[in-house]
Amino acid sequence: MQCALYDAGRCRSCQWITQPIPEQLSAKTADLKNLLADFPVEEWCAPVSGPEQGFRNKAKMVVSGSVEKPLLGMLHRDGTPEDLCDCPLYPASFAPVFAALKPFIARAGLTPYNVARKRGELKYILLTESQSDGGMMLRFVLRSETKLAQLRKALPWLQEQLPQLKVITVNIQPVHMAIMEGETEIYLTEQQALAERFNDVPLWIRPQSFFQTNPAVASQLYATARDWVRQLPVKHMWDLFCGVGGFGLHCATPDMQLTGIEIASEAIACAKQSAAELGLTRLQFQALDSTQFATAQGEVPELVLVNPPRRGIGKPLCDYLSTMAPRFIIYSSCNAQTMAKDVRELPGYRIERVQLFDMFPHTAHYEVLTLLVKQ
């Protein structure tokens, strides 16, 4: 992938950009095999990759510069700003949005937040695109509600320029820290969720719900999990750390009982909406802590699917699963190091199948799907 920002030494986020994709995949596979070297793996499936560029469905832009000439991108460690509107990871559809946002920031008088001076209002612009219909969600992260009335007043101009903006919100993040968003979300549109569709499964994206940033690879990840589950004698499963329900909604059948657990209530609202659309009445989604939910149960289903954050599922949940011994565990991980650590805490299981998904090209990161079977 060619990147003028990298070539000019202005951005180093894609540290592996000079390596061809096959070499990147080989290095990631070697890393994964090294992490799982202590465990016999019955089947290594071929790694899955997607497009080299233009694959991201989300942009997280730090806003800097002046209100007349805002920059959208990032801050270097020394505080100097870098405009990343031309980043080749973004699809071509993002360029006209960035182009319209710069004059809009001036029109609405949204002074960019100055980290050094702790002054200004507009901290971040967060943009998400649906692959299914090209609709977009735009979030303005502000320090306070001071400029909210001005933003509302100027908004019709932006909506006229960009009819693809289906969901527009303001998020209030008052703290002087590098935190992307605060708790308060103010909707400026009637529509509150972005419609997405993977493999004929309707999914919803709300402002404060996590959603995978590489839809081409994520849709293959969900489809693979569905195929693996279909091969197992499973009538009842848990989907822990379920997010918007991507795994559970793909794996569920009309006669299967499924419970999805996720701490973020926004994500659970999305999952419930999808389940209702699919007419799946035996699916239950609840906004709870996954570990607390599981360890309070006196029995387990045949299959437990886990998709934890980078820290992994942790020892308490590993101990519980070891004791309760569901017949199958499917572990989806964005951090193979913590997954390997967790697998070590599940001594009663063998690894039947592993597959790497190159969710984050040009970096050392990857997603991995692992099927564990009780010995």
From Swiss-Prot:
Keywords: 4Fe-4S, Iron, Iron-sulfur, Metal-binding, Methyltransferase, rRNA processing, S-adenosyl-L-methionine, Transferase. The keyword Disulfide bond does not apply. SUPFAM superfamilies: S-adenosyl-L-methionine-dependent methyltransferases. GO terms for biological process: rRNA base methylation. PROSITE patterns: SAM_MT_RNA_M5U, TRMA_1, TRMA_2. [4Fe-4S] cluster binds at C3, C11, C14, C87. Its EC number is 2.1.1.189. The active site is at C334. It catalyses: uridine(747) in 23S rRNA + S-adenosyl-L-methionine = 5-methyluridine(747) in 23S rRNA + S-adenosyl-L-homocysteine + H(+). The keyword Cell wall biogenesis/degradation does not apply. Belongs to the class I-like SAM-binding methyltransferase superfamily. RNA M5U methyltransferase family. RlmC subfamily. Catalyzes the formation of 5-methyl-uridine at position 747 (m5U747) in 23S rRNA. This is 23S rRNA (uracil(747)-C(5))-methyltransferase RlmC. It comes from Escherichia coli (strain SE11). The lineage of its organism: Bacteria, Pseudomonadati, Pseudomonadota, Gammaproteobacteria, Enterobacterales. The gene is rlmC.
